[in-house]
């Protein structure tokens, strides 16, 4: 934790140990049982206060390109940095969102079943885009059907009356 602060961090969420004395934590350190879930919850709270459309993008390939095209085309939009598209990167990006942005565009990657569900539940997109279902990521997902199932997890977390954009064929 001290290394993080010496490298410029201003706040830390750490895994609390049973024998940890909460009074000895620094004021800018939060000890929790599950740091990933705590980070996700903070991101959800931030996004609940955002009034613009939230766009979630996943797929075997084309995620970053699609994100970049949308970001270039939507004035004053926010998008995930580079490909910070996992359970740590996406919530961190959400916490950097300026509530004055016109739209928020999030890229979501997956290495295993449940990854897209976890990420899309954080952002609860108004628009969900699946760019492509292909043979990439087969190592963790076993088959093309596995890739389809994982990428389709996005659909279940699109807001009511939201829009899903999926490939044809």
Where are the regions a protein language model picked out?
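N-terminal leader/targeting and accessory segments in enzymes
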Residues: 1-41
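Phosphate-binding loop of NTP-binding sites
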Residues: 31, 37-164, 168
């Amino acid at each position: 934790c001290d290394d993080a602060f010496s490298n410029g961090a201003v706040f830390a969420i750490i895994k609390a140990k049973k024998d940890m004395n909460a009074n000895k934590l620094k004021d800018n350190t939060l000890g929790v049982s599950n740091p990933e879930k705590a980070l996700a919850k903070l991101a959800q709270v931030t996004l609940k206060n955002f009034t613009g459309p939230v766009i979630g993008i996943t797929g075997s390939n084309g995620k970053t390109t699609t994100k970049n095209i949308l970001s270039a085309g939507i004035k004053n939009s926010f998008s995930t940095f580079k490909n910070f598209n996992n359970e740590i990167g996406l919530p961190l990006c959400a916490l950097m969102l300026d509530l004055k942005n016109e739209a928020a565009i999030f890229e979501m990657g997956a290495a295993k079943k449940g990854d897209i569900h976890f990420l899309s539940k954080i952002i609860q997109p108004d628009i969900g885009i699946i760019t492509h279902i292909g043979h990439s990521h087969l190592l963790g997902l076993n088959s093309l059907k596995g890739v389809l199932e994982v990428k389709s997890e996005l659909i279940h977390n699109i807001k009511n009356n939201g829009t899903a954009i999926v490939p044809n064929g």
